[in-house]
């Protein structure tokens, strides 16, 4: 599979999602260890359903494949949802579905790249996310990116018979310190 390097970091890059990757995503999401951390955990992800999701995501332009910079291996995806360009706000989500890349900083870097896109190119002011209380690894990663906890919905999710809090976190553009995107804008000469 060929990926396009839209936003590049030191370990990974974000590429527009490709409908041909639907099977890889469906396989990743079929792993309960991966899916339990996501809102979709109780759902059964079929290949046709995942293909439909990816095709829909391609049309929004706000969902990216996360790809390892060294090997060009697809490792997950991230994106913005409910983008409100008038109020300059959005929600975001991420998953690293290839477990070989867990605990190596890929999720943190991919989220920072996504936030850089949101704040530098879309000119958003606020980005919010939700995470389960048992997902300590993700909470630490989000704190590293600059997210702050803004509230909890207590015992709002029952997973494997246990009640868990949903933690709400957000970050403002003024709080984001990991920005890298620089788009050189040079004056165009008037051709007469």
Label the predicted regions.
Residues 142, 147, 169:
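Conserved active-site tyrosine of GNAT-family acetyltransferases
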Residues 120-130:
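Conserved GNAT acetyl-CoA-binding A-motif
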Residues 103-117, 139-144:
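Conserved acetyl-CoA-binding loop-helix of GNAT-fold acetyltransferases
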Residues 9, 61, 75, 87, ...:
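Short coil/loop residues immediately preceding or within conserved phosphate-binding loops
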